[in-house]
Structures are given as structure tokens and as C-alpha cells.
């Protein structure tokens, strides 16, 4: 499998963690998804975390909060042992994302990575 075929892009908020009232210091992991990320990492996957966090509070100017957002997410990942290779900020803030390769978090958590094949 080539490198792209073993790369996943994963949203952060309400995908790998839950947060109440934007209290990111007290975010809680979505255990089933984090467990699947650990499994994926141990099987050689590259994990890119891509988030729209900060886009609202910066009015779409992510450079104003980029360092803060990356530090919030890196701290969470360290605290809860969430594997990742890179944190990418600046995902457009939207009500809906339409993507032919998308999975809902519960679908991902139940996915058999050994018998899954990508749509490239």
C-alpha cells in the first residue's frame, strides 16, 4: 500500500474528543475513536489531525490563534495518549462537509482496518 493509502485525516472536535462550553482544558476523549487511532498508528498509518477550531473566534484569520489551537490539541493528545503525526489548523468553518472518503466517527470506530481498502 502506498503512503497516501495509509494516511488518514481526522477531525478533532466531536470526533476524537468532546468539550463542554469550549473548555478545551477539560475535553474528554471519545474512547472508541481514540482506540481505533492507536490501532491504526500501530499498523503504520500516518494520522493528520485537521481542525476548524479557532476559525470562529479568529473570524477566519487562523494565524491569530494558530499557536494557541495547536497547543490545546497537542496537550489533549499528550494527556490522553492520542497518536498523531501532524496537527493542521485552518480547516474552513462550515455547517457541512461533503467528501467521498468521509466516515462518521462511529463508522471509523467500528472499521476493520485489516479488511478495508481505500477509494483512491
Give the role of each language-model region.
Residues 1-120:
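HAD-like aspartate-dependent phosphatase fold
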Amino acid at each position: 500500500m502506498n503512503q497516501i493509502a495509509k494516511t488518514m485525516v481526522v477531525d478533532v472536535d466531536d470526533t476524537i474528543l468532546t468539550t463542554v462550553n469550549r473548555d478545551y482544558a477539560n475535553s474528554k476523549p471519545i474512547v472508541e475513536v481514540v482506540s481505533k487511532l492507536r490501532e491504526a498508528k500501530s499498523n503504520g498509518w500516518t494520522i493528520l489531525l485537521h481542525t476548524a477550531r479557532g476559525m470562529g473566534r479568529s473570524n477566519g484569520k487562523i494565524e491569530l490563534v494558530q499557536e494557541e489551537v495547536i497547543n490545546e490539541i497537542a496537550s489533549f493528545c499528550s494527556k490522553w495518549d492520542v497518536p498523531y503525526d501532524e496537527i493542521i489548523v485552518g480547516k474552513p468553518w462550515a455547517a457541512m462537509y461533503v467528501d467521498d472518503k468521509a466516515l462518521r466517527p462511529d463508522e471509523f470506530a467500528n472499521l476493520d482496518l485489516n479488511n478495508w481498502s481505500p477509494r483512491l
